[in-house]
Amino acid sequence: MSVTMREMLEAGVHFGHQTRFWNPKMAPYIFGHRNRIHIVNLEKTLGMYQEAMKYIKQLSSNRGTVLFVGTKRQARETIAAEAARAGMPYVDQRWLGGMLTNFKTIKTSIKRLKELEALVEDGSMEKLSKKEALMFEREKIKLEKSIGGIKDMGGIPDAIFVVDVGYHKGAITEAAKLGIPVIGVVDTNHSPEGVAYIIPGNDDSSKAIMLYARGVADAILEGRASATNDLVESIKGGDDFVEVNEQA
């Protein structure tokens, strides 16, 4: 979970967008500009990143769920891999409208996906005609692509982690309606509004995206481990010897 300013520099976290595309609401997090590119103040980014990771760790220690969201080409693989490593749901292809606000409908699609997966696992698909099998296979692939990352998400997540808030305005709007905290990477060309835990920085570099996502996954795993350790300690502490009077 620990990240240094040098690691942020090496990942290019400090590189913002062209100055002409800037969002004035990001002014407090901008150090200056070089060659018409805004430079993010990494002293602020590091502190805000650490605050966000602290929150995620605490949430995870209380068995909270964090939904990873990153559908940009350079983010997809990393988001899926790090979410899977942390045992968390993710959206890596396309944000479907209503994924949070209309989760009942999404659950119907998840149920259908699991039914199709069961057909494959128990061999039932092989008993169908070629035409039917092909139709079901296409349906399964389509559902896997759109909701495969959230098929084990039992309900609304406790928080969402978003790479590139401008690219995922729909997700942030839905989270706001439901009061779900957003941990978001916000570049110099976007607004930080609606983001509870802002991580000011580059949202285009694959190295930077890896740094953020790996940090979130590490924080989740650390939180889960600390909760397990606390449970073990509490069990040990309550394991006092009690003498039983057999004559009673």
From Swiss-Prot:
SUPFAM superfamilies: Ribosomal protein S2 (SSF52313). It holds the Pfam family Ribosomal_S2. CDD domains: RPS2. One of its GO terms (molecular function) is structural constituent of ribosome. Keywords: Ribonucleoprotein, Ribosomal protein. GO terms for biological process: translation. It comes from the Bacteria. One of its GO terms (cellular component) is cytosolic small ribosomal subunit. Belongs to the universal ribosomal protein uS2 family. PANTHER family: 30S RIBOSOMAL PROTEIN S2 PROKARYOTIC AND ORGANELLAR (PTHR12534), SMALL RIBOSOMAL SUBUNIT PROTEIN US2M (PTHR12534:SF0). This is Small ribosomal subunit protein uS2. It comes from Herminiimonas arsenicoxydans. The gene is rpsB.
